[in-house]
Amino acid sequence: MGPTRWRKSTHVVVGAAVLAFVAVVVAAAALVTTGGHRAGVRAPAPPPRPPTVKAGVVPVADTAATPSAAGVTAALAVVAADPDLGKLAGRITDALTGQELWQRLDDVPLVPASTNKILTAAAALLTLDRQARISTRVVAGGQNPQGPVVLVGAGDPTLSAAPPGQDTWYHGAARIGDLVEQIRRSGVTPTAVQVDASAFSGPTMAPGWDPADIDNGDIAPIEAAMIDAGRIQPTTVNSRRSRTPALDAGRELAKALGLDPAAVTIASAPAGARQLAVVQSAPLIQRLSQMMNASDNVMAECIGREVAVAINRPQSFSGAVDAVTSRLNTAHIDTAGAALVDSSGLSLDNRLTARTLDATMQAAAGPDQPALRPLLDLLPIAGGSGTLGERFLDAATDQGPAGWLRAKTGSLTAINSLVGVLTDRSGRVLTFAFISNEAGPNGRNAMDALATKLWFCGCTT
């Protein structure tokens, strides 16, 4: 039922009543204000003072007390001796001054696990525009108005086959459907789909990767064309991954075009081929955030290759590693002892020192490398987001550093790492890097206890 309509006469009556009421109010006001105050009528009370608003975000003070090296060493002595930490390497630094406050085996290369992604993110921030996007194209496979079309991948693993309006794992992902619409407007009638994944070179699996991790949802073969980073179930974080991601991307395009997906092949696009369609990934800064918060291995490998191509290195595992370490060295971040085989940290063959990891964080938090400052915002928040969302929430410690600590986590079998920045209870900003190899069954909890103790420390003596 629609709203009741008022008749014209109703409007007239109501309008007259309103005018009469206004006239009475005006007359009453005149009696009070023009003829002096009537007996028994009080003057209006003064308006209340505006409330004082406290800032929601307050910058840390440069004058906050710096912990002493002796105080930090004494405070961490017991927790750092926990046998569940196994072989522990670590370093703690004052963010503002760069002063080293604590170290243990900080120059000994150990398996860093996913904290390796800190180096990948740092190199990307130093090399690429934060708004950089990756283009996935479709070109004509020949000169005829009917014929094959070629899906040309450039390293965007987030391309999705989901229809418009349907969620995908990656926010802002490009869609196969948009490619199809453009192809249909191009005047070309596709008869087959081919996939050009030649932008990437070398092996698709890094040394030290376990093929079982494909089924476990940790990784997929790294190819220049992919759908949902190879996920079989696009919106499930630990979905089993495809072993043929480039072919799968072509098959999804073929299905959307009404062609036989089984007929999709791998082929190089003809030189100078006519572009029929193009879509773009989300901006780099958004993809970095997804990589760091979800510890996304496929994303890390593809971003490593973005750094590689930007400084004329091959888009391969070795090319990306060389590009990342070279870029950090150019920024005066010491990578001595680094021996890496991937950009994600998934391989057990990777080696990094706590010194390199902490130096990267100190560069981001300190005053000398403003291009790295966004790295701090990319880190998960203790008790709040990403891989730290469920950590540091122990009620017995009043939640400790929850909200005060941001860090990248790392976890492999018997390996734990935690690298980041915190504001201690004295208001001082500290950077830290902890790597634990040969860890015991409670190794992760022991590492959290180490970081919590540092936050509580305030060790000025």
From Swiss-Prot:
Query: What span is annotated as the signal peptide, if there is one?
Result: 1-28
Alphabetically list the UniProt keywords. Carboxypeptidase, Cell wall biogenesis/degradation, Hydrolase, Protease, Signal
Q: Which InterPro entries match?
A: Beta-lactam/transpept-like, Peptidase_S13, Rv3627c-like_N
Q: Please give the GO cellular component terms listed in this UniProt entry.
A: extracellular region
GO biological-process terms attached to the record: cell wall organization; peptidoglycan metabolic process; proteolysis
Q: Pfam family of this protein, just one?
A: Peptidase_S13
- Its EC number(s): 3.4.16.-
GO MF, one example: serine-type carboxypeptidase activity
Q: Which family does it belong to?
A: Belongs to the peptidase S13 family.
What does the record's miscellaneous section state? Overexpression in M.smegmatis leads to elongated cells and promotes the formation of increased numbers of Z-rings.
Which protein is depicted?
A: Carboxypeptidase Rv3627c
Name the source organism. Mycobacterium tuberculosis (strain ATCC 25618 / H37Rv)
